[in-house]
């Protein structure tokens, strides 16, 4: 009787829910927020809501495609790691071939949307980001060097630039400054998780920094990056992109982030690393929300 009532949850899972999970929707949502900030800060001479919405859909589709490719390429190591063994492919919820078709389909739709109804620059930059994450990072760098996150971080840092170019059709130093913030944020964000999951990464021979250089070295690197991030976050104020609301928010958030890094380095407890990882997500979310609100209040 109990066996009859005990139904595997994976059997009840909708195929749509499975494919939705493959796109890493929470990650994509954060990327879209940073894209919206890029759009908001860009000159608005040629702005239309129609174009902005299509741009966001196109960026989301290609980001989801990159995430699905990541699931596909990493399916064997995901099956061996405690953090990822319940993902759709290791659980058998979907076949690798179907994931490949899904990734190609939504990636193609995203690229065509950007190319036909936004502009070619945004389409090609988004495609380059997809290749950078799905191929260069996931297929090669992740398994090749402990600096994988640093080198490939540019791919995940591109959304503000994509938002900017979707409105203007051109590159601008202010957009690259937003990219720099995410680029510097990425290593301490991922290294905190890597410390918490060090044994997992070691088990599948992924050369994350704590595995190859030790936890203490990684903690020092996180602290240095946190300090550098605090400095970089002040640049939007110095170049006139943001005002006092952003300045206050950035100061508070960076003080908290650096305090986490100091605690991790000198007074770490068992869960300090994972707590810093989780805070880093809220850090980026709140920082870009502050930048967006600051810009809207200045209008």
Curated annotation (Swiss-Prot):
Its main location: membrane. InterPro entries: Protohaem_IX_farnesylTrfase, UbiA_prenyltransferase, UbiA_prenylTrfase_CS, UbiA_sf. Its EC number is 2.5.1.141. The chain crosses the membrane at residues 27-47, 53-73, 97-117, 121-141, 149-169, 175-195, 222-242, 244-264, 273-293. PROSITE patterns: UBIA. Carbon 2 of the heme B porphyrin ring is defined according to the Fischer nomenclature. This is Protoheme IX farnesyltransferase.
């Amino acid at each position: 009787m109990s066996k009859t009532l005990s139904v595997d949850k994976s059997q009840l899972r909708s195929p749509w829910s499975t494919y939705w999970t493959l796109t890493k929707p929470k990650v994509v949502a954060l990327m879209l927020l940073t894209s919206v900030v890029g759009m908001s800060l860009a000159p608005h001479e040629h702005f239309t809501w129609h174009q902005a919405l299509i741009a966001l859909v196109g960026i989301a589709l290609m980001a989801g495609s990159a995430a699905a490719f990541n699931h596909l390429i990493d399916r064997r190591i995901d099956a061996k790691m405690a953090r990822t063994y319940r993902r759709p492919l290791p659980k058998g919820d979907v076949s690798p071939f179907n994931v490949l078709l899904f990734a190609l389909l939504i990636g193609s739709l995203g690229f065509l949307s950007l190319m036909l109804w936004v502009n070619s620059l945004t389409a090609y930059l988004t495609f380059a980001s997809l290749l950078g994450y799905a191929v260069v990072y996931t297929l090669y760098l992740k398994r090749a060097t402990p600096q994988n996150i640093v080198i490939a971080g540019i791919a995940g840092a591109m959304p503000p630039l994509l938002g900017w170019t979707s409105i203007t059709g051109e590159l601008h130093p202010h957009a690259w400054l937003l990219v720099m913030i995410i680029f510097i944020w990425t290593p301490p964000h991922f290294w905190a998780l890597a410390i918490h999951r060090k044994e997992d990464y070691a088990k599948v021979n992924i050369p994350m920094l704590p595995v190859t250089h030790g936890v203490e070295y990684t903690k020092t690197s996180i602290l240095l990056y946190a300090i550098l991030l605090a400095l970089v976050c002040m640049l939007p104020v110095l170049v006139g992109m943001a005002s006092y609301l952003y300045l206050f928010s950035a100061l508070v958030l960076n003080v908290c982030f650096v305090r986490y890094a100091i605690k991790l380095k000198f007074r770490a407890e068992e869960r300090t690393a994972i707590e810093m990882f989780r805070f880093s997500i809220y850090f980026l979310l709140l920082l870009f929300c502050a930048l967006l609100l600051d810009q809207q209040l200045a209008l």
